[in-house]
């Protein structure tokens, strides 16, 4: 029989992930905070979070699947090939490399205090991105993103390895500073998030298999489905919110949350 408390916790964490994944406020940071305040910060929770993050990644894949198929479609004429695979590789390889290299050390940062500092740093970065962005966009289509822009975005995406900084905040903020149109920056950010989130979820699961219990699978599945469904229901609306809202607003929100963490803890 399912434990009602575990079911409720799974639903809460799933909803949090489903909403925060698409905003530059750090979904991982919010899950860490929620786990701490719900007093469920244990090994079993880590497995639950892996399933939940995988659910949101699948929702992104579903939402952008037509765009992704066009990107990956082989074209004999290289000159006419849209956003090539190399652009995506350049944007994700730095995070993969440093994520694998410092995996154990990064996991030691998963606590509320480090999230608090990362929320502040990420908030400052969002403010800088919005204040110092070019007056005119240089890149107005995802197909026009250059290899150099992809590489720079990939470099700054490394900061997302610090829990609470926000992967989307790092990539969208960097892209906007590079003169990429906001809607294009958002689209590119979430397309490159798919292999990273799925890869990270798989690698985390492999490293935490010793904590996996088959009896807990229904709880994990509930979290997975809640995250997937909430993400599917919210993604279109939330992407519109990011596109129409100044990054300064999200920066201020991050400062408020970090302040709450400081005073409550």
Curated annotation (Swiss-Prot):
Coiled coil: none annotated. Its main location: membrane. The chain crosses the membrane at residues 7-27, 45-65, 86-106, 108-128, 145-165, 186-206, 214-234, 245-265. It is found in: Cell membrane. GO terms for cellular component: plasma membrane. Keywords: Antibiotic resistance, Cell membrane, Cell shape, Cell wall biogenesis/degradation, Hydrolase, Membrane, Peptidoglycan synthesis, Transmembrane, Transmembrane helix. GO terms for biological process: cell wall organization; peptidoglycan biosynthetic process; regulation of cell shape; response to antibiotic. It is a multi-pass membrane protein. It is an enzyme of class 3 (hydrolase). Its EC number is 3.6.1.27. It catalyses: di-trans,octa-cis-undecaprenyl diphosphate + H2O = di-trans,octa-cis-undecaprenyl phosphate + phosphate + H(+). Disulfide bonds: none annotated. One of its GO terms (molecular function) is undecaprenyl-diphosphatase activity. It comes from the Bacteria. Catalyzes the dephosphorylation of undecaprenyl diphosphate (UPP). Confers resistance to bacitracin. Bacitracin is thought to be involved in the inhibition of peptidoglycan synthesis by sequestering undecaprenyl diphosphate, thereby reducing the pool of lipid carrier available. Belongs to the UppP family. HAMAP family: Undec_diphosphatase (MF_01006). This is Undecaprenyl-diphosphatase.
């Amino acid at each position: 029989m399912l434990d009602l408390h575990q079911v409720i916790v799974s639903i809460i964490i799933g909803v949090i992930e489903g909403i925060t994944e698409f905003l530059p406020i750090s979904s991982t940071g919010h899950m860490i905070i929620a786990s701490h305040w719900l007093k469920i910060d244990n090994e079993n929770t880590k497995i639950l979070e892996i399933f939940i993050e995988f659910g949101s990644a699948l929702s992104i894949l579903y939402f952008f699947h037509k765009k992704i198929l066009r990107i990956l479609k082989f074209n004999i004429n290289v000159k006419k090939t849209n956003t090539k695979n190399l652009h995506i590789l350049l944007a994700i390889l730095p995070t993969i490399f440093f994520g694998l290299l410092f995996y154990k050390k990064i996991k030691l940062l998963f606590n509320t205090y480090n999230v608090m500092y990362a929320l502040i740093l990420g908030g400052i970065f969002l403010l800088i991105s919005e204040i110092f962005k070019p007056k005119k966009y240089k890149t107005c289509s995802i197909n026009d993103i250059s290899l150099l822009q992809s590489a720079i975005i990939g470099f700054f995406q490394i900061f997302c390895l610090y829990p609470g900084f926000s992967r989307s905040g790092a990539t969208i903020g960097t892209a906007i500073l590079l003169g990429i149109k906001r809607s294009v920056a958002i689209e590119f950010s979430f397309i490159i998030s798919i292999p990273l989130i799925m890869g990270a979820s798989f690698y985390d699961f492999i490293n935490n298999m010793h904590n996996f219990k088959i009896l807990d699978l229904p709880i994990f599945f509930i979290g997975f489905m809640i995250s997937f469904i909430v993400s599917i229901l919210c993604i279109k609306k939330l992407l519109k919110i990011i596109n129409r809202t100044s990054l300064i607003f999200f920066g201020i929100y991050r400062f408020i949350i970090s302040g709450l963490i400081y005073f409550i803890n």
